[in-house]
Structures are given as structure tokens and as C-alpha cells.
């Protein structure tokens, strides 16, 4: 059934205008974004397919344009629109976390890092620079590519820590493959950076391996 053939109070756009966005289901909100469907599948059904395929709204939040190609009927324009909206949502959530949260627990860091790195298609090494009260000063991406002990320069991390007057740091990198287990190279790099930063009295609190669905704390594994 076409959405235009639904009763007026069941059409997503009319429902939103009459009752507000909170009255709509996740699939209905996505239908408004999609606007049109395919023969035999309306926008509401396509919205539900997106939710089913990617694990709900939380899963969609970590989905990139390439993964959206698996949904029949999503052309380049629609994929770009969805990715843009998801990126705005990630940025809004990241700003809220940055303003409200002290990064004093692994879970607080996990939430922030998954928003920032979880959906990236390429491997990225990043550092959270924290003040003496574990408030975030900055998150900086310092390297892109396969992570090795020689690909990340300790000197660069030390220079940035001093420039930002950081008291401690949290290291992080993503595994686009989805494998969250730290490698031996991850362990060696962590110890190299820990030694370098200790020379300027900056503590390495943790090193996280981030995927779309998981962020693993190396400190909790006794590897920091």
C-alpha cells in the first residue's frame, strides 16, 4: 500500500505535524527522510528494513554509505541524505557528552569513542587529551592507516599533549573489520607511548579498540 493511501492520521508527515515527532515510530521518521519507496515496498516498509538490517537506530548511527548499498532502492542521493542526518546526530550526541561528562569511567569513554570512531571505514589512531579533572580538552586524529609501532610517532603525541597542557590521555583506534581484540602491535604501541608520555608527566589512562558495536578497554585487560 502506498503511504498516500493510508488514513490521514496514519501518514508519517501528517502525524508529525498534528502530534509532534515523539508520536512517530523510528520507521515512520525514516520514512519521512526516504520520502518514496519502490514498487511493492513503500517508504515506511523501507524504513523498517533499515532498522531490521542494521540493528535499530543505534546500529544505524554507526552505518556508513557503503553499507547502505545493501538496501535495494537506496540510490546515491538517498544514501547521502541518510548519512548526513546520522552524522548530525552523532555530532549532537558527541557535543552533549563532551559538555556533560567527565571521562572518569571506561563506559563514558566508550560512549564517546563509539560515536566518533565506530563507523569510520578506515583505521584511525586518535588521542583524547584530558585535563587534571578528566575533562576532555580535545580529541585529535593523529594517524590514518594500518596501526604499527612505527606508524604513530611518540614525539607527535608528546608535542600535542604539551601544547594542550594535558594531564592525561586516552589512546584509541578503530578496527573497521569489526574485530575488537587488541593485537600484539597494539600492546607494543601502548607501552611505547606510555613511556614517552611519562617523561613529561602525562599519564596514559587507557587504550581503546573501537568497532561499530564494541569498544574494548585495554586497561581492563591489564594491558596498559
From Swiss-Prot:
PROSITE patterns: MPN, UPF0758. Pfam families: RadC (PF04002), UPF0758_N (PF20582). Residues 102-224 form the MPN domain. GO terms for biological process: proteolysis. A motif (JAMM motif) lies at residues 173-186. It comes from the Bacteria. One of its GO terms (molecular function) is metallopeptidase activity. Zn(2+) binds at residues 173, 175, 186. CDD domains: MPN_DUF2466 (cd08071). Keywords: Hydrolase, Metal-binding, Metalloprotease, Protease, Zinc. Belongs to the UPF0758 family. This is UPF0758 protein Pnap_3339. It comes from Polaromonas naphthalenivorans (strain CJ2).
